Each structure stands twice: as structure tokens, then as C-alpha cells.
Amino acid sequence: MSCARALAACCLWRLRTGALQPLSAYGRRISVRFCSSGMTLDNINREAVDRIIRVDHAGEYGANRIYAGQMAVLGRTSIGPVIQKMWDQEKDHLKKFNELMVAFRVRPTVLMPFWNVVGFALGAGTALLGKEGAMACTVAVEESIAHHYNNQIRTLMEKEPEKYEELLQVIKKFRDEELEHHDIGLEHDAELAPAYVVLKSVIQAGCKVAIYLSERL
């Protein structure tokens, strides 16, 4: 498919947190940019890219819901601005993956409504344990996401990395920001949370299940 035809098709729709809406001018530029740099719908491994974009979109959506839950409980406390800053970065991540979903015609996971509820509940629930509980959740989730992004980087590097240069740049940038969030959590007493090791292990086990399901459903 030519860039012009891909652009014409993409202009008909846009994804915002799982809903299809008309594509904005910004989304159109994203589609053209990827076409012009060599990463088109024709010359990529569609199955691999579909899985990567779908699961990353779901992960960033879930992260947004977690931070929303934390802010609902701790937004007016001293840790509120710290959580808000991390949440703002996660909003940028989600926006980018919304655009990539449109540009590469990737459907969202069918589990979006489930992650909506579970993410908020996890964020609010751990925040009810106090600042330390919220930060423990942040450490567990961000560590899992960073590890997941590293796996994706290795996968794309094995599949003619020059074709996926821009996608690799996005994933690497977001991986680094997730690691920053991880370190912020540790700096704000995550390890002082009640039953920290158990809590972290349970959350990370849930993250593994979420990644597995979101790639496939």
C-alpha cells in the first residue's frame, strides 16, 4: 500500500483509549512520517508490530489508570505532585501509542474495559496503604514494563532494525522514563511498604499475566 493510500485510510479514524474517532491533523503527520522513513504497512512484520503496539498501548493505558487511582487517594498529600509528574509522562506515552495504533491499523485489546477497572483499583488500593504502598506499586509495575520493553527492543533488533528505527526510538525513550519512575518510587520509601517483597511479587505476577493476555486478545 502506498503512503498516500495509507494516509487516506488512516484519516477516517482515530483511537482514543479504545474508541474510534476521526483522526486529527497530528495523527496524520505521524502516519506520513513513518511512511517517509521507510516503516510502512508493506515492509514490516505485521504480526510482530501488531502485538507490540497492542500490548504497549494496553500497558500504558493500565499505567494511566493506576496513577489515576493513586491520585484519587493521595492527590492532596505531599506525594501528590510526584505522582502527578509521573502520570503526566504516562499520558504522553498513551497518546503516542494511540497514534501508532491508528498509523498501523492495530486494534486494541478486547480487555481494555477490564484493565480500566483493575488498573484504577490497583492504584487506589495500594495508595490506601499509604505513600509507601503507592510507591511499591510504582516500582513493581515500572520494573515489569521496563523489562518488557527490553524484550521488545531485542525482538526488533533481530528483525532488520533499520525498518523499525522510529518504533525502537519510541520504546527506548519510554523504557528509560519507566526506569526513572522506578527509581523515584525507591527514593520515596517504596521498600518501607507493608510486606514489600510479597506485594511487589504479586503485582509483577499480575503484570506478566496482563502482558500475555493483551498481546493475544
Curated annotation (Swiss-Prot):
<feature type="binding site">
    <location>
        <position position="90"/>
    </location>
    <ligand>
        <name>Fe cation 2</name>
    </ligand>
</feature>
<dbReference type="GO" id="GO:0031314">
    <property type="term" value="C:extrinsic component of mitochondrial inner membrane"/>
</dbReference>
<dbReference type="Pfam" id="PF03232">
    <property type="entry name" value="COQ7"/>
</dbReference>
<feature type="binding site">
    <location>
        <position position="181"/>
    </location>
    <ligand>
        <name>Fe cation 2</name>
    </ligand>
</feature>
<comment type="subunit">
    <text>Component of a multi-subunit COQ enzyme complex. Interacts with COQ8B and COQ6. Interacts with COQ9.</text>
</comment>
<feature type="transit peptide" description="Mitochondrion">
    <location>
        <begin position="1"/>
        <end position="34"/>
    </location>
</feature>
<feature type="binding site">
    <location>
        <position position="142"/>
    </location>
    <ligand>
        <name>Fe cation 2</name>
    </ligand>
</feature>
<dbReference type="GO" id="GO:0046872">
    <property type="term" value="F:metal ion binding"/>
</dbReference>
<keyword id="KW-0520">NAD</keyword>
<keyword id="KW-0408">Iron</keyword>
<keyword id="KW-0677">Repeat</keyword>
<dbReference type="GO" id="GO:0005743">
    <property type="term" value="C:mitochondrial inner membrane"/>
</dbReference>
<comment type="function">
    <text>Catalyzes the hydroxylation of the 5-methoxy-2-methyl-3-(all-trans-polyprenyl)benzoquinone at the C6 position and participates in the biosynthesis of ubiquinone. Catalyzes the reaction through a substrate-mediated reduction pathway, whereby NADH shuttles electrons to 5-methoxy-2-methyl-3-(all-trans-decaprenyl)benzoquinone, which then transfers the electrons to the two Fe(3+) centers.</text>
</comment>
<dbReference type="GO" id="GO:0010468">
    <property type="term" value="P:regulation of gene expression"/>
</dbReference>
<feature type="binding site">
    <location>
        <position position="93"/>
    </location>
    <ligand>
        <name>Fe cation 1</name>
    </ligand>
</feature>
<feature type="binding site">
    <location>
        <position position="51"/>
    </location>
    <ligand>
        <name>NADH</name>
    </ligand>
</feature>
<feature type="binding site">
    <location>
        <position position="212"/>
    </location>
    <ligand>
        <name>NADH</name>
    </ligand>
</feature>
<dbReference type="GO" id="GO:0006744">
    <property type="term" value="P:ubiquinone biosynthetic process"/>
</dbReference>
<feature type="repeat" description="1">
    <location>
        <begin position="48"/>
        <end position="129"/>
    </location>
</feature>
<feature type="binding site">
    <location>
        <position position="178"/>
    </location>
    <ligand>
        <name>Fe cation 1</name>
    </ligand>
</feature>
<comment type="pathway">
    <text>Cofactor biosynthesis; ubiquinone biosynthesis.</text>
</comment>
<feature type="binding site">
    <location>
        <position position="216"/>
    </location>
    <ligand>
        <name>NADH</name>
    </ligand>
</feature>
<keyword id="KW-0496">Mitochondrion</keyword>
<dbReference type="GO" id="GO:0160224">
    <property type="term" value="F:3-demethoxyubiquinone 3-hydroxylase (NADH) activity"/>
</dbReference>
<dbReference type="InterPro" id="IPR009078">
    <property type="entry name" value="Ferritin-like_SF"/>
</dbReference>
<feature type="repeat" description="2">
    <location>
        <begin position="130"/>
        <end position="217"/>
    </location>
</feature>
<feature type="binding site">
    <location>
        <position position="60"/>
    </location>
    <ligand>
        <name>Fe cation 1</name>
    </ligand>
</feature>
<keyword id="KW-0560">Oxidoreductase</keyword>
<dbReference type="GO" id="GO:0110142">
    <property type="term" value="C:ubiquinone biosynthesis complex"/>
</dbReference>
<dbReference type="InterPro" id="IPR011566">
    <property type="entry name" value="Ubq_synth_Coq7"/>
</dbReference>
<protein>
    <recommendedName>
        <fullName>NADPH-dependent 3-demethoxyubiquinone 3-hydroxylase, mitochondrial</fullName>
        <ecNumber>1.14.13.253</ecNumber>
    </recommendedName>
</protein>
<keyword id="KW-0809">Transit peptide</keyword>
<feature type="binding site">
    <location>
        <position position="208"/>
    </location>
    <ligand>
        <name>NADH</name>
    </ligand>
</feature>
<keyword id="KW-0999">Mitochondrion inner membrane</keyword>
<feature type="binding site">
    <location>
        <position position="178"/>
    </location>
    <ligand>
        <name>Fe cation 2</name>
    </ligand>
</feature>
<dbReference type="GO" id="GO:2000377">
    <property type="term" value="P:regulation of reactive oxygen species metabolic process"/>
</dbReference>
<dbReference type="GO" id="GO:0008340">
    <property type="term" value="P:determination of adult lifespan"/>
</dbReference>
<dbReference type="GO" id="GO:0005634">
    <property type="term" value="C:nucleus"/>
</dbReference>
<feature type="binding site">
    <location>
        <position position="90"/>
    </location>
    <ligand>
        <name>Fe cation 1</name>
    </ligand>
</feature>
<keyword id="KW-0503">Monooxygenase</keyword>
<dbReference type="GO" id="GO:0008682">
    <property type="term" value="F:3-demethoxyubiquinol 3-hydroxylase activity"/>
</dbReference>
<keyword id="KW-0472">Membrane</keyword>
